[in-house]
């Protein structure tokens, strides 16, 4: 990671436990993970702040052309090989389910940069970094739903869109509300459903991605699996202060 975002990440991590937001994040972590606040891992706030602040700095301040330089390995080469191994673009239309992970924008940037020439993308989100990214890859923008290109539609499961339909699922033993999508629509237009999850931090040498493919009728299961993956890598999620969106819709 470049000097400025690395410095900013260290400063934010140093201050992480001394803010009012830290109390809210601790309470939300305790609620979601079903543990007393006294059992929240001591380093959780510091690690979470370090992960998020550095990559958020990159996505907000730097142009997308510089994003990949903030990873210690060749992210584009990794993603190109990984998508090939996964047959990631084998469907004519793919609904890609993500969440607001640390560095999610950098991963999507690598997808945009390395996808086959006939693949186009569209984002259903209000996330400013992703709109900034799409503007930088204008040639990848889907011009028409019925254009003769393979299409990847990116939907963030932990974001609430205006007037979006919701469905109820379980986050552990708690009820949660996620964005619903018509399985009839997905089936009619030949969509497959895919998840996109980090195995560990983009800072780590052992970084990797995992993805599962689902049939259109299993959309809700894919969405629930995406949410519950949060339990594996809680320090990488950027929305611990926004848990009410999931619990109350």
Regions found by a protein language model. Give the residues of each.
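Membrane-anchoring hydrophobic helices of lipid-metabolizing enzymes
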Residues: 1-98
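Short catalytic/ligand-binding loop motif for oxyanion handling, primarily in non-cytosolic enzymes
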Residues: 61-66, 103-106, 131-132, 162-164, ...
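A structural signal for well-ordered alpha-helical scaffolds and beta->alpha junctions
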Residues: 21-22, 26, 130-131, 179, ...
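Non-catalytic C-terminal accessory region of glycerolipid acyltransferases
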Residues: 42, 92-93, 113-114, 140-249
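Generic structural marker for isolated residues within well-ordered, non-membrane alpha-helices
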Residues: 26, 108, 226
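Catalytic cores of transferase enzymes with a strong primary signal for eukaryotic protein kinases
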Residues: 51, 55, 111, 231
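Catalytic core of membrane glycerolipid acyltransferases/transacylases, capturing the structured
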Residues: 91-150, 169
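Amphipathic coiled-coil/heptad-repeat helices and related helical stalk/stem segments
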Residues: 78-81, 104, 178-179, 222
């Amino acid at each position: 990671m470049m000097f400025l975002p690395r410095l900013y990440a260290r400063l934010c991590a140093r201050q992480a436990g001394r803010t009012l937001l830290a109390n809210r994040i601790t309470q939300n972590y305790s609620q979601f993970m079903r543990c007393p606040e006294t059992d929240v891992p001591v380093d959780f706030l510091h690690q979470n702040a370090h992960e998020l602040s550095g990559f958020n700095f990159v996505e907000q301040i730097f142009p997308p052309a510089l994003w990949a330089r903030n990873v210690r390995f060749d992210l584009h080469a990794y993603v190109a090989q990984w998508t090939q191994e996964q047959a990631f673009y084998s469907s004519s239309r793919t609904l890609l389910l993500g969440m607001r992970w640390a560095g999610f924008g950098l991963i999507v940037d690598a997808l945009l940069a390395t996808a086959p020439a006939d693949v186009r993308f569209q984002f259903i989100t209000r996330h400013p970094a992703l709109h900034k990214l799409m503007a930088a890859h204008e040639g990848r923008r889907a011009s028409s739903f019925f254009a003769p290109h393979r299409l990847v539609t990116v939907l963030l499961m932990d974001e609430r869109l205006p007037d979006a339909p919701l469905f109820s699922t379980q986050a552990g033993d708690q009820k949660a509300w996620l964005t619903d999508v018509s399985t009839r629509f997905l089936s009619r237009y030949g969509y497959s459903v895919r998840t996109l999850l980090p195995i560990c931090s983009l800072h780590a040498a052992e970084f990797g991605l995992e993805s599962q493919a689902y049939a259109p009728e299993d959309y809700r299961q894919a969405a629930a699996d995406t949410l519950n993956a949060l339990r594996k890598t809680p320090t990488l999620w950027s929305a611990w202060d926004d848990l009410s969106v999931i619990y109350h819709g």
